[in-house]
Amino acid sequence: MIPLDPAQRAAELRCRLQEANYHYHVLDQPRIPDADYDRMLRELDALEAAYPDLATPDSPTQRVGHTIATAFSEVRHTVPMLSLNNAFSDPEVLEFVRRITACLGETAPGFSAEPKLDGLAISLRYQNGIFIQGATRGDGVTGEDVTANLRTLPTIPQRLQSDTWPTVLEVRGEVYMPRPDFEAYNTQARLRGWKVLANPRNGAAGSLRQLDPHITAQRPLSFYAYGIGEVTDDVSFHRHSEILASLRAWGFPVSPLVELVYGSEELLNYYRRMETIRDTLPFDIDGIVYKLDDLSGQREMGFVARAPRWAIAHKFPAQEQTTTVEAIEIQIGRTGAATPVARLTPVQVAGVTVTSATLHNADQIARLDVRIGDTVIVRRAGDVIPEVVTVITDSRPLGATAWSMPMACPVCGSEIVRETGAAVWRCSGELACPAQRKEAIRHFVSRRAMDVEGLGVKCIELLVDAAVVHGVADLYHLSLDQLLRLRLVTNAQTPTMLLREARDHVTGMRYQQLEEILRTVGVDLSGEGDVPKHWQIDVLRAQWPDFDWNHKKIATKWAQNLIAAIDRSRQTTLERFLFALGMTHVGETTAKALAHSFGDLAIIRQLPWPLFKCVPDIGGEVARAIGHFMDQPANQQAIDDLVERGVRITDTHPPTSTLRDQLTLASLLEHLDIPKITPLRAVQLAALAPTLPLLAEAALDTLLQAGVSQPAAQSLTEWFQSPDNISLARRLQHCCDVLLAQLPSADRAHTAPLNGQSVVLTGKLASLTREAAATRLEMLGAKIVGSVSKKTSFLVAGEDPGSKLDKAHALHVDIWDEARLLAFLGQYSAQ
């Protein structure tokens, strides 16, 4: 039993300390001396130590004191943390405003103009006014739980002020390190022999991701709020400026530099003023964010891909420095793109040591006339990617010659080619090129593709160089023995060290075999000769004797975890699989659109390129790239190999009925991009024959007599004279007929069982991912939303559902468990 006086005193101290925090960090009006604050904090800490039941999660004493974590858990954002499109010039800002005025019909709409802090974006979740969880932005959909570390920031309220806040509130903002505090920290770090921080942004990000909150508490971090995520229905807003005002009232610091401005002229004036005072601010900013103030206007403008159309980041010119070009090298990407890179004399740019900079492509080098030995101006584009922007030709050394793209790939020796009209040169080696294979595998296992955790860049390079992995399908044949060999060899800095470590796992004749392998690759075991440069790769390529691995002498958990992660990736969704294939021009959005429209890998891999234009937002260039990829026997073999090794698509479904209008003969003629065949002319031609092959037989005179114009008729007949085009037309018609046969009937299309229904998913599902479940439900007409409200049709609840389930009960929303969901999906599939 807690005596009454200590409980009252603890409550009083918490109230006074929270009020002091609010006045100090939000209002910038300290009410009590620091000494008094420290005295009250110590008194409260002593009371909570004497009476542990007095401690509350929102107590100021809880800002430090959590145990060290072993890793950060994932947090799925209820409302995605979107990225912003960038503007680097005034005309881009003017175009941004023009689009909004044209859409909304307003001549001078209001915008919230806010400095873009150079820190780490986070999301703070409050329930009933109490801070319960904080997460990093991550990839915008999933972040890391850094709640314990965020509790150490005095600028983040543990309990909200006032009593007007909603039941559930997600606050979005930026954790940053003030410049004076950053400099003071580095001064102390140098005196104490600690590692100094590279720049305030890296300092903020690294500090917030410390596993030990005590370390975070020692770092001078601060926070500004700039928006909201999920908010329950008991609070509503009409303007973004109202949101910021409410955040201030609830205890959050909001930048005092935020202004409400009207029209493009005021936007640019604000930008100029901030650019002028940028270097005098106590924190780093890399631009200005403009947000449409009217929330109904925001909803009308909507989004494109992962960015809102009602907001934009107007970036400042990046910081620049001069340095010297020591060499120009070629890097080969996963699609074969040959990107020239300048190797530079190291130079500090925006707090980072820059040793190389992109030259983008051969045309850019020609425009700049960059040569080896030149003095150049380097900047960090967007303050992230270093690039060469100008050559100081007055400093050019005598004899410097113009650079030209090499004709052979520096990695595999294949010809480097450029398609007519393209800016990018590409290695023609495709998957025969180790550089492309490495990048293809790196992309394949990435988080938003097949999501194989634990397979890093260095490991991928060694697996490819050692010929253990030739393509992505080989990952599914990796064994524990292969991975342990990799670790044993790479940990050995010298051949002698390898032999010493190997004695724990192999003896006798097999040990002698290993010695012979080393001799074969050119190693002098006497230790007198030079060690071959690539001895580790050559040793890994050799036929090894069997090892009896001593698990006490070599770490195996990482290898077991990696094999388990690879195995888990065998079950995936169609959009992830398509994205993982790394097709040129196919990002996540396009992969999702393909999966939604066609629904089945077996269909997609057989389609000719024009049918990909049936998918919304896929144009001719992207469609041709997808078709080209699927037409390559090596790529088809790679897909076969993946399927053979157990990769399964878990969300296969029939093609969407919306394709029907795109599969008419007139639409097919449009998709073929035949010169002179306009949409109107395509409709006219479609009336002359039921199929493409029959239309191909029509003579020029027949077309002219039917009223087709001379240019269009001539163009069509010439196009059909090509055997390749005839073959394409026949294939296109056949695939079109197959697709039409698989489409849901028109009646079924209009009576999708979930048309108009809003569905929320929460908790973990055992049989399929929430992502896959959402896709299946969307195919049946449902709209997937992030929060429960009175308008929610039903909630799908898996394990550990959280507060959404409680709210669904309170609002009498229908609740489905996983069994009911699977039964419903199975019933539809059966139909």
Curated annotation (Swiss-Prot):
One of its GO terms (biological process) is DNA replication. Its cofactor is Mg(2+); Mn(2+). NAD(+) binds at D34, A35, D36, Y37, D38, S83, L84, E114, R137, E174, K291, K315. Its EC number is 6.5.1.2. Zn(2+) binds at C409, C412, C427, C433. It catalyses: NAD(+) + (deoxyribonucleotide)n-3'-hydroxyl + 5'-phospho-(deoxyribonucleotide)m = (deoxyribonucleotide)n+m + AMP + beta-nicotinamide D-nucleotide. GO terms for molecular function: DNA ligase (NAD+) activity; metal ion binding. It holds the Pfam family HHH_2. Residues 749-831 form the BRCT domain. InterPro entries: BRCT_dom, BRCT_dom_sf, DisA/LigA_HHH, DNA_ligase, DNA_ligase_AS, DNAligase_adenylation, DNAligase_N, NA-bd_OB-fold. The active site is at K116 (n6-amp-lysine intermediate). GO terms for cellular component: cytosol. It comes from the Bacteria. Keywords: DNA damage, DNA repair, DNA replication, Ligase, Magnesium, Manganese, Metal-binding, NAD, Zinc. DNA ligase that catalyzes the formation of phosphodiester linkages between 5'-phosphoryl and 3'-hydroxyl groups in double-stranded DNA using NAD as a coenzyme and as the energy source for the reaction. It is essential for DNA replication and repair of damaged DNA. Belongs to the NAD-dependent DNA ligase family. LigA subfamily. This is DNA ligase. It comes from Xylella fastidiosa (strain 9a5c). The gene is ligA.
